[in-house]
Structures are given as C-alpha cells and as structure tokens.
UniProtKB/Swiss-Prot annotation:
GO terms under biological process: proteolysis
Protein name: Probable cytosol aminopeptidase
EC top class, as a word: hydrolase
Lineage: Bacteria, Bacillati, Actinomycetota, Actinomycetes, Micrococcales
Record-listed Mn(2+) 1 binding positions: D259, D336, E338
Sequence positions that bind Mn(2+) 2: K254, D259, D277, E338
Length: 502
C-alpha cells in the first residue's frame, strides 16, 4: 500500500488556455440546465437543454469543443447549487469517470473555499484500487484546476494543493486497508503497516500490544473475540502530541479484520463483505495521519482494537463470560456482536488518560444501515453539545451524521444479565439494535478528575462505510466515511480551543 496521490499531479492555474484532453464544466439542475454566470461556456446551455441534460449529480455529458478536433467538453452535474461541497463532489465524480491523461476542471470559481473544495474533490476522485486486478484502471495523470480569483498567491495555491493531497492520500490508505482481503491483512500485519507508515512523522508515536501485553492488561474483550483465530489480536495506540495544545481527543476504532460471526455464524451472503469490518480502525488511523501531517494544535490519541472473529474449538461460545479491561463482565449472548466487545476495552483504556473528549467509530450494527441507509451515520453519546458539534463538522465537509437519542429506560433494562454485569445482545427482539449498541458502549464511559462523565460520542458508520454504487468521488466500495468530518472537528479544537464544542 502506498499513497496514490503521488501518481497524479494536480495544478492550480488562472491561465484561460485550454490545453487538456478534456475540459470539465459544472452544470446545475433546475427548470433548465445552468452553468456558472461567468462561465465561458454558457453558449452551450441551449445545446444541453436540447440533449435532455438535467444537471443531476454524477450526470456526465461529453460534447466536442467547437473548433477543436481533439478536445472534449465534459459537463458534470452538481445538483441544485454551485456550493463548495457540491463542487467538490462534482469534481471528484468527473475525475472518477474520465480516464483521459490530462483533465482541466474549469468551474469558474471566484472564492478560495470553493477552489480548495474542488482540488480536494479532484484528488479524492483519482483513487483507484487495482491490487488484485491484472489490468490497471485508467486514471488521469495531470489535473489542472482553473480559477478566476483575484489576488490569490502561488503560495496559497501550493498550500491548498498540499492540504488536499494529505487528506486524500490518507483517506486512500484507509480505503486500501479496507479493500485488502482478510487473508492479506490480519491484526499483526495491520499493526505493522500503521507503525511503518507513520514512522518519521513529527510528534507521532505508535505502540502495538501483542496478546501477551493484552493479557497483562486484562483486555478480555479483545482477547475473547480474537481467540478463535490463528492470527492473534492486537491493540495499536497512536499518539500525536504537538508542542502546544489545549485539548485532548481520543479516537477508538473497531478493527475486526474479518468477521465470520464466530459460532453465531453469519450466512454466506452476509459474510462476503466482512473484510470491511475494520473500517473504524482504518479511518481512525487516517485521521491521526492527517492531523499530524497538517500539524494541528490538538493532542489526538488513536486506539485501534484489532481482532479476527473466527470459529474454532477455542472460539468464544454463546453464554461465555468475558471480563473487560474496566473490570466489568459481559455475558456473550451472541458472538456476532463482537465489535462492541473490543471497543469496550478500547474505550476504557482511552478513558484512563482523562482526555477532554472520546469518540468511537465502528461498523457496529446492521440496524444502523436499515434505519439510516448508506448516506448517513448514526451518532449517539452522552453530551448533546458534542453531538451537535459533530453534526456541524460533518455537514461542512458534505457528510451526514444524525443524532439518535439513547436515553430510554427500556434500553437500560435490556442490558441486564442473570449471571454477569451486562449482556452484549438483548434476549428480546423488540430492542432497537443501533441504540442498544450505543447503550452497551456507554457502560464503559469514564469520569474526569471532577467526577463528571467525559464527553463521549459513538459513530455507527455501518451504512456509509461501504458504497454499493459509484457516486461523487467514491467508487463502489469503502468510502473513508467520517475521516474528513473528524479532521474538521480536530481543526475546530485546534483553531478555537476555547469555543464550546462539548
């Protein structure tokens, strides 16, 4: 695995000359297709209308450029408005769909935030995963992004490109991890990759706990889930500690490198995509990488809870009792609810450091996908202000988080076990699965030195973690969901640490 952004060159230019193979122009939807007011290609609006172009997202229409035998105009739909997020998705969609060697994105932008969004979208759209293909996918080699911004300096343009490259490259590495098959990526190999990739980055350190260390620390959740596999579990701690900071954020990621369901075996159709069950850990790694490379002034600690959930003579059985790191015992009523068991250890370990806020991310429940679909992540926690701040951060980068309440007495009662502290799955089928998963994890929240619960949020990304169709800058497969949202949240903590976010 390597940073794919090193294989594509993105340039920012104010040069009006059309020197690319394909010129990409945005078109918005409405009663008639609309181009930006100052676009040099507005004369094509009538042609687009006659062709039935709607301007809907991902719609791509190719027309030969007047007076040129070799240059093609590609009109990409942006939806209803030329907003920064819509332009980002449109740029990414065009780059994803067009295989020409040189592309010029001419969106007639006059604002720096829109230019930044377009460059980021272009980088994200250039991602390809060809590890297991005999023939490589076509991908642009040069992407020129033109603009109409007065007074922007070359230095500012370089900064925009550098930032977008860091974000897209890190998201790409997370996607590579998720795309890699279970037989090529077991817990120890995952841990080794993270340590090697982050080596040499300023202010960042990586610590990997093997099964012996996990045993010494009494991490019964991670050990229990991993004991049925020939490949033992790992816990990876990534620490980013800049020279100056005022806030400390802990991120905990579920990292089940393959999930058979254990003895509560999944059906074959449900097992096929279970290499994706380590999305949370992969995306936490990406957030730490971005935050460190962008040198944000916020301390961030990542906890990657890595295990393979297999079935064997040594696998945990329904009815077994696991003692987690916190000392709390769990009756395993279903071995296919293993993600919450590894997160239980990760959350308690994160709490030991008394950070200002803890956020976990996991493909935790199928119920989240049923309830919210593929475009929205479930957001739950113990602090309404934190949930609101995360929703705002997500919206600003074009993602969707929906806060879901979990303060329900019935959910609390469903945790009850006859022989242990709690169960991992309720015996009643009337309990909402997504919310119960969060209520289970809430049992492992920690108090700060003042005796108050540390603000905690749980992101269930089971729906948007994996796209079932191509859209925007994402091809079918892993999406890197929540990475950019959490980076934006970190940026807020870094730039305005006194601002009330939780």
């Amino acid at each position: 695995m390597s940073d794919y952004t090193n294989t594509v060159t993105v340039e920012i230019t104010s040069d009006d000359s059309l020197v690319a193979d394909v010129i990409v122009v945005p078109v918005a939807s409405g009663a008639v297709p609309r181009l930006p007011e100052d676009s040099k290609f507005r004369a094509y609006e009538d042609i687009l209308q006659k062709l039935g172009v709607t301007g809907s997202k991902d719609e791509l229409t190719r027309i030969p450029l007047d007076g040129s035998k070799h240059v093609v105009l590609a009109f990409i739909g942006v939806g209803k408005a030329f907003s920064a997020t819509e332009l980002m998705f449109a740029a990414g969609s065009a780059v994803r769909q067009i295989g020409a060697r040189c592309i010029q994105i001419d969106f007639s932008v006059t604002q720096k935030d829109k230019l930044s969004a377009i460059v980021e979208g272009a980088f994200l759209g250039a991602y390809r995963f060809d590890k297991y293909r005999s023939k490589k996918s076509e991908c642009p080699e040069v992407i020129r992004v033109s603009h109409n911004i007065n007074g922007i300096t070359d230095s500012e343009c370089r900064q925009i490109i550098a930032r977008a490259k860091v974000i897209a490259g890190s998201v790409g590495l997370a996607k590579d991890l998720v795309n890699t098959t279970g037989d090529d990526l077991y817990p120890a190999q995952f841990a080794s990759f993270v340590a090697k990739d982050l080596e040499g980055i300023d202010h960042i350190s990586v610590e990997s706990w093997d099964e012996k260390r996990l045993q010494e620390k009494s991490c019964g959740g991670i050990l229990g889930v991993g004991r049925g596999s020939n490949f033992p579990p790992r816990l990876v701690k990534i620490s980013y500690t800049p020279g100056q900071y005022k806030k400390h954020l802990s991120l905990v990621g579920k990292g089940i490198t393959f999930d058979t369901g254990g003895l509560s075996l999944k059906p074959a159709s449900a097992m096929l995509g279970m290499k994706y069950d380590m999305t949370g850990a992969a995306n936490v790694f990406a957030v730490l990488r971005i935050v460190a490379l962008l040198r944000l002034s916020v301390r961030v600690t990542g906890w990657l809870c890595l295990a393979e959930n297999m079935l064997s003579g040594s696998a945990i059985r329904p009815g077994d009792i696991l003692r987690t790191y916190s000392g709390k015992t769990v009756e395993v009523t279903n071995t296919d609810a293993e993600g919450r068991l590894v997160l239980a250890d990760g959350l308690a370990l994160a709490g030991d450091e008394r950070p200002d806020v803890i956020i976990d991310i996991a493909t935790l429940t199928g119920a989240a996908k049923v309830a919210l679909g593929e475009s929205c992540s479930g957001l739950m926690g113990n602090n309404p202000d934190l949930l609101c701040s995360l929703e705002v951060a997500a919206k600003s980068v074009g993602e969707k988080f929906l806060a879901v309440p979990i303060d329900d007495d019935a959910l609390q009662k469903a945790l009850k076990s006859d022989i242990a502290d709690i169960v991992n799955v309720p015996t009643s089928n009337k309990v909402p699965g997504m919310q119960f998963g969060a209520v289970f994890l809430k049992e492992f929240e920690t108090t700060n030195d003042s005796g108050e619960a540390i603000p905690w949020a749980h992101l269930d990304v089971a729906g948007p973690a994996n796209a079932s169709y191509d859209t925007g800058f994402n091809s079918c497969g892993p999406t890197g969901v929540a990475v950019r949202s959490l980076v934006e949240f970190c940026r807020c903590l870094s730039s305005a640490p006194e601002r009330k976010l939780f």
